[in-house]
């Protein structure tokens, strides 16, 4: 059996790949803007120097205005006061959550993010539909029908990260659908595995496997 947590986690990994891809593009765009701004400032500085050389100032005359200096580059800010790179960086945890858990600032960030990147909105919407399927108290047969409808929606999109996640789910579909038989999860087994790993780390390795298993059964049995 594969529970809903791992399914949603796999889809969120696909969304995370998209976020990182768009972030890298935003970083490249920001660097190009900064370089173009610096180049423009250098050009204006050379023009001012050339003008001062051709029109030397009379020291007896009062300066009419303050001397112009090079301006510092200021990146373009979005409506919430963040740059594109900052918005994409701070969206990591937000995109892994359900929309009903967002606060006001996250809702505003999500609105701007989805306006700037419609593909991420489409991917997040597809993930929310899978969440809704697993939250529904339906039979295994009904879940299979809904899951196949979701496959068709993914087929219609052009998001390669979500399609890769869809293929992974499709390959384990029978195990995924077993979740709807009694809605049980692997939480207990994963908790026990975590405890055993922690216990093994405290021992700094295992010299006698039989004695280690005996101690595990005694402590966690």
Features from the language model and the residues they span:
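Conserved beta-strand -> loop -> alpha-helix junction used to position metal-binding or nucleic-acid-contacting
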Residues: 1-36, 190
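Acidic/histidine-rich catalytic cores and adjacent linkers
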Residues: 28-221
């Amino acid at each position: 059996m594969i529970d809903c947590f791992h399914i949603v986690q796999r889809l969120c990994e696909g969304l995370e790949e998209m976020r990182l891809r768009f972030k890298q593009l935003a970083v490249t765009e920001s660097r190009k803007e900064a370089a173009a701004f610096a180049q423009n400032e250098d050009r204006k500085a050379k023009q001012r120097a050339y003008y001062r050389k051709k029109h030397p100032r009379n020291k007896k005359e009062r300066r009419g205005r303050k001397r112009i200096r090079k301006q510092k580059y200021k990146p373009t800010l979005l409506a919430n006061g963040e740059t594109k790179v900052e918005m994409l960086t701070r969206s990591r945890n937000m995109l892994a959550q359900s929309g009903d858990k967002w606060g006001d600032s996250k809702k505003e960030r999500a609105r701007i993010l989805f306006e700037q990147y419609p593909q991420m909105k489409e991917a997040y919407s597809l993930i929310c539909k899978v969440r809704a399927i697993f939250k529904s108290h339906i039979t295994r047969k009904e879940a299979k029908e809904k899951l196949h409808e979701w496959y068709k929606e993914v087929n219609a999109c052009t998001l390669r990260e979500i399609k890769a996640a869809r293929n992974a789910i499709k390959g384990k579909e029978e195990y995924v659908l077993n979740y709807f038989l009694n809605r049980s999860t692997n939480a207990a087994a994963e908790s026990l595995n975590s405890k055993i790993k922690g216990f093994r780390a405290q021992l700094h390795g295992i010299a006698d496997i039989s004695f280690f298993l005996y101690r595990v059964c005694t402590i966690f049995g």
